Curated annotation (Swiss-Prot):
Keywords annotated in UniProt: Cell membrane, Membrane, Signal, Transmembrane, Transmembrane helix
GO biological process: protein secretion by the type IV secretion system
Segments crossing the lipid bilayer: 518-538, 567-587, 613-633, 651-671, 684-704, 775-795
Pfam families: TrbL (PF04610)
Name assigned to this protein: Uncharacterized protein RF_0092
Signal peptide annotation: 1-20
Record bears the keyword Nucleotide-binding: no
GO CC annotation: plasma membrane
Entry similarity comment: Belongs to the TrbL/VirB6 family.
Amino acid sequence: MKILKSLVLLVLFMAMPAKADDAFSWMSTSFGGLKSLFGCLEVPEFTSFKEGNIGISLSTAGTWQSTGNSVEKGKLLKINWSTSGITPEPRKYLVLYRIDPRFSTPQVFIKTYNYSKLQFEALGFPRFVTDNNSATPGAIPPDKDLDALSFTKMSDSVKYFNYSNGNSRIEVKAGDVVNISLVGKDNFFSPNTLDNILTQELDSSIFAASALYTQSNLGNFDNRIIYSSAKEVCDLIDASRDPDKPSGCSGTGSATKYKSINSNEALVGKPMITRAVQNFMGLINSCPANAGINTSPACYYDQGRGMIIKVGGQVIKERDQSFVNSGSTQSSFIYYQATSGGTMDFTSDWQVNNMFSNSVLMSDWSRNFSNYANFVDYINKNDWSANFLYFGRYSMIVEIGNGANSINPGDQQNISLEYLITSDGTLPDPSVRGTPVDYNFAADAPQDGYLWLRVVNPNSNIQGVVSVNYANYTGTTWFSDIIYNGAIKPITDQFRTFSQNFYIKLVKNSAVQNIAKAALTLYVTIFGLMFVAGALKLTAVEVITRICKIAIVAFLIREESWSFFNTYFFSAFTNGIDFFVTNVVGATSSRANIFGFIDPIFDKYTNGRIWGLLFIELLQIHNGLAFIAIITIYSLITYFRAILEVIIGYVIAFIGLTVMISLAPFFIILMLFEKTKSLFDNWISTLLSYVVQPTILLIFFLLIDQVLSEQLLKVVVRACWDTLIPIKIGLDLTNLGIPINFSFTLPFLPGIPFYVPDVPEISSSNILTNKANTFLVLFTTALLFYSYCLMSYGLVTFVNIVVGMLTNVTPARISGNYQERSDPVGAVMQDIGSVTKPIKKAAMAPARVFKDKIIDQNYKARKPEGGEHTNKFLAERNDVPKKEEGERKE
């Protein structure tokens, strides 16, 4: 004994220096590497649909846009799009504001942008024919032939600036945002103008008092206004009034006059020749604030000063107010949001009256002169010296928009969306036509390939982005294909044919026809006798009702009876079931398969990751997760059975519907008489109940399914690679009298590695929040999941009661058993259970053995009567009485 003790101690002393961290570190590292290799199994997300969205700008209309999404033939493709992000394009105008002494108000030339033609239009501008033989009659500038100038031209010009010749003002609506920017003259005289109107300056080297001009003769200095007395101007260019200096200045003080030295061009807003105006503009500076006509020295107004802008009579820019200068864009602008609507006016309170001593208004000339020669003499003989100078111009671009404004219905209807599926990812040519889709489009993909979308927009006056949401089913369809295409559709098609054939044979039967004719004859006879006897008080409604009844029964015995009633009456019931089922279901795998909604459900509850995590939980016997997994699996089996009940309920409802339709001739005849009309009403109620029952059943079922999906994700937890069963080696020598008792784990194999559920312990931080999947949360969630599955299992009975209350049609009662209502679906499920009972028992036998021998560790059976061990390893079950056991053997 002493020798044995000594050997044991020697082994222990020799083993002590060999620590796991030192000698077996590579083994420990290898085990940790497995953990990082396998990682964790996350709870899957139920994504049977691949969804996406894309915004397609109207600026890219006609060009195919890639979604980056691939679709599969025969599977659902849904496209929803909206035009809520589309607004009208801002209304754009080019405006030339010019001072001309011949008009009492400033000249305003307006060009409107036409988005359809992508050009500006000078609406209502007076076009003068210059040469009938010209290829472009009406070309601008006007002709230089003075003999062709007439008072008609002057009248048209006056009408144009008074907006009475087709020239419309700029309209502004309440809420519109108005942006006015100063631009160069080249922007206004853009070649991008319809019919080349106002594409270049209206100017002529030959003076014509009746012609229109646009040039302000400021040379390179534009967007400026001169408003100064002749004295201040002459004090700059000819202060001494030197008669030898051809300045055009005469007189002193308030009697100072200025006259253009070459011609009378001051009449048309051109008081100086180009060289003179260049010198003059170089001498003056920008006017100070609150400057006026007598400000000394002479100055010019810029940044929009000197011009008043009104909207609906409300001033939005004062005369002395400057445009805002943007340093980043080097532009001057004014920004305004209209509080009320109206027309936009460009005007000024500086008057041109009294600039000359004689009348210079074109409106007066057209009234006072009837002879062109007299008008020419008037212009040539009078002295056109100016008392003050008021000339210049502003070129502006006006943009008006309103993001709150919606496009008009016509423009909205013209916008369409097309989709295209290609076999490869190559950009399709714009000439390739696609399939138009409505706002809520759902159909099965015609082929495999990549999805492309494009907007077709014939309207160029709107802007924005069309928002498109798309989704396509990516899961499997095997279950619905088997259930619907393999089982249900053949049954429904067969019963449709049966119903039609039976109905036609019934209508053609001579006995039925004689009954119908006799009923009609009797109905008309009784109606006539009662009417003659005065027993009826006929109203228009009653007369129409009786006529309709007679017409319906008379049409019933005709050859085209089936075609008529099936088209206008029976189809409302036979197609009504499919219509309601299809429209109630949100997620489905195929539009052509009314049971496609089952595919996403089976994709969720047959997900391999879900069942893998449940299997991992089954292995957690020591902490109770196995019990939760068993509850979940049993609940899923119960739910699958409920799905089968829904399918059987649909089939039974359709069969009952077709049978009722095949008997329609009998019930339609019964509607003639009040005593038999109740049978006809009950027949209609029965038809309606067969339509309503599967619809309501499906609605309840889908609502429960939404809750079940959320609960299932809470029952299943993620699992990470870890030690499933720890391995500890213990050594207890106390029985040998040696005071040694310890245990240790192998450093290279601390336990059997496998996936272990990641379940946190219950703590004060998570017990109240229920956010962490603790054991308590998992257990309560599993019970809820089980309750919902039981709820779905009892839906058929509940829906039968609801439909009976709605349609007043109750199922027949079984004799005995407290007169319980019959349940065809329950009977079918009971028969299925009887057939599958042997399979169920065979599947449960291994589970029972596992429970007895592994979990309960009942290796040695006890005597049923005494409770003592029989000493028989793996003996018979002791919970089976001998009597039952003997009967079972027999």
